[in-house]
Amino acid sequence: LECHNQQSSQTPTTTDCSGGETNCYKKWWSDHRGTIIERGCGCPTVKKGIELNCCTTDRCNN
């Protein structure tokens, strides 16, 4: 599985997920800097107030 791993609005980059990982994620939240977006492999548990989108196809998390 190939997932995007760039932060916020940086130039898109991808990573090959290891260990049979089947999910990519994108999570985002807002603070004094604006909206922060984090992407990567897996489907993490997030705290209240953080939006999370998990998906299961290559490069689906941009």
Curated annotation (Swiss-Prot):
Domain of life: Eukaryota
SS bond partners: C3-C24, C17-C41, C43-C54, C55-C60
Expression sites (tissue/organ): Expressed by the venom gland.
Spans annotated as Disordered: 1-20
Name of the protein in its database record: Alpha-elapitoxin-Nn2a
Gene3D superfamilies hit by this protein: CD59 (2.10.60.10)
Keyword Signal attributed: no
Species classification: Eukaryota, Metazoa, Chordata, Craniata, Vertebrata
Coiled-coil residue windows: none
Further comment found in the protein's record: Constitutes approximately 1% of the whole venom protein content.
Family statement: Belongs to the three-finger toxin family. Short-chain subfamily. Type I alpha-neurotoxin sub-subfamily.
Cellular localization per UniProt: Secreted
A Pfam family recorded for this sequence: Toxin_cobra-type
GO CC terms, sorted: extracellular region
GO terms, molecular function: acetylcholine receptor inhibitor activity; ion channel regulator activity; toxin activity
Protein source organism: Naja naja
Its biological purpose: Nicotinic acetylcholine receptor antagonist. Binds to muscle nicotinic acetylcholine receptor (nAChR) and inhibits acetylcholine from binding to the receptor, thereby impairing neuromuscular transmission. Produces peripheral paralysis by blocking neuromuscular transmission at the postsynaptic site. Induces concentration-dependent inhibition of indirect twitches and abolishes contractile responses of tissues to exogenous acetylcholine and carbachol, in the chick biventer cervicis nerve-muscle preparation at 100-300 nM (in vitro).
Keyword vocabulary terms for this entry: Acetylcholine receptor inhibiting toxin, Disulfide bond, Ion channel impairing toxin, Neurotoxin, Postsynaptic neurotoxin, Secreted, Toxin
